[in-house]
């Protein structure tokens, strides 16, 4: 008899729990104002313009060490600004792709470790990613 009462109480508790169940609250996605997004884009593009000048100057010189340093610093600087949560996906993706291309070119610029064709492919990828970055930053941000 006690087991039957316990079973009825358990079933009743289950019915109450199921009928009162509420869907889990979905986490809110932060939203940013147009001004915040524009500021993040401007910061990224200002950083890109700075690193592009350094990369252009140092990779066209006669010191491979300076070229590698410029590429590595450029990738790190782009990484630091592309993490701004107010930055839109188009700008973030372009910055991430360019930073990765800079790192790959740095690695493949060692003439003893990679063939010329691999270096040229990495250089071509940098040029393509820079063109994409120029496009997203064409209007100042």
Identify the function of each model-found stretch.
Residues 103:
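Active-site proximal helix/loop that lines the substrate pocket
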Residues 32-93, 106, 125-127, 131-134:
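Alpha-helical segments in soluble extracytoplasmic regions
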Residues 110, 114-141:
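Extracellularly exposed regions in secreted/surface proteins, prominently low-complexity, repeat-rich
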Residues 1-27:
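Hydrophobic single-pass membrane-targeting/anchoring helices
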């Amino acid at each position: 008899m006690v087991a039957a009462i316990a079973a009825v109480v358990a079933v009743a508790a289950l019915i109450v729990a199921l009928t009162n169940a509420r869907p889990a609250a979905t986490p809110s996605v932060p939203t940013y104002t147009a001004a915040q997004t524009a500021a993040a884009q401007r910061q990224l593009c200002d950083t890109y313009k700075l690193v592009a000048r350094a990369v252009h100057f140092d990779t066209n010189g006669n010191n491979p060490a300076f070229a590698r340093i410029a590429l590595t610093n450029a990738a790190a600087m782009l990484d630091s600004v592309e993490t701004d949560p107010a930055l839109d996906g188009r700008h973030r993706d372009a910055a991430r792709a360019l930073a990765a291309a800079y790192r790959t070119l740095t690695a493949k610029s060692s003439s003893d470790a990679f063939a010329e064709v691999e270096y040229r492919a990495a250089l071509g990828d940098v040029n393509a990613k820079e063109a994409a970055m120029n496009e997203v930053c064409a209007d100042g941000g």
